[in-house]
Amino acid sequence: ACNRDLKFRFLLERSQALGFDYLATGHYVRLQAPEGQPTDNDPGTQSSALSPQHSVLSTQSSALSPQHSAFRLFRAADAAKDQSYVLYMLQQSELARLQFPLGALTKPEVRALSRERGLITADRPESQDICFIPDNDYRRFLREEMPASIRPGPIVHSETGSVLGQHNGLPLYTVGQRRGLGLTSHEPLFVTSLDTDSNTLIVGPSEAVLRRTLHAAGVSLVSGAWPAEPFRCLAQVRAHAQAVPAQVFPEAPGSLRVEFEQPQRALTPGQAVVLYEGDEVLGGGRITRSE
């Protein structure tokens, strides 16, 4: 929500109201302009060598416009700092007014350039705080700001159905979590799902966390076109996870089903699934359920 609604939508609207042509951010991601269209973005990021001329989406469906007529988004040159996963929702109208000057640089290069220019941020420690939660303690934030959402309830074993204990509130847990459950068991137990209807935390053995299929809603595709046929690509389900082979099945507009070649761990509702072809960002959406 921070990137979508504040850093981009609000700031783009504000910059346009102030008469600026572009908004530049420090995100590590590369942007390529349509063929023949000049861009003020970092010149090192605009090479056609970034990826094949047409993406998998344009070759899989005739209903899609060819990618060389649209802005295209790519992973950063510095793979360790790449932030493309959190920018999948950017639209063509937004990309046309954005610049990402750090996309072709590594973090050490950025620090060196900052020192040369005497910027106070040159040696500032990196921050990965949650937006608007400076201490990064989202559990404290929820308890203080949304106490009604923190309701204790049962912890149930996914295979036996037995009640193992009591949780402290579903928003305080995440799929795949092992520590902090407050359980004593002869086997390691992990959160496999959260049943919000019954306020029940479901736990089970490690293999119970594996899923092969996810469903996603609120899907946004960088090209702006919607595929008419299934297509193969790479799918990434966490910010620092590896993108892995999958097949994508378009459903209703804005919804997708993603089937992985291999079972994946902790496909968590609420997290994003982002689709790639090589380094190119195709789009993504919010995971609603997995199976």
Predicted regions located by residue number:
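Nucleotide-activated chemistry modules centered on ATP-dependent adenylation/adenylyltransferase
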Residues: 1-44, 68-282, 286-290
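Intrinsically disordered, low-complexity repeat regions of secreted/extracellular protein precursors
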Residues: 46-68
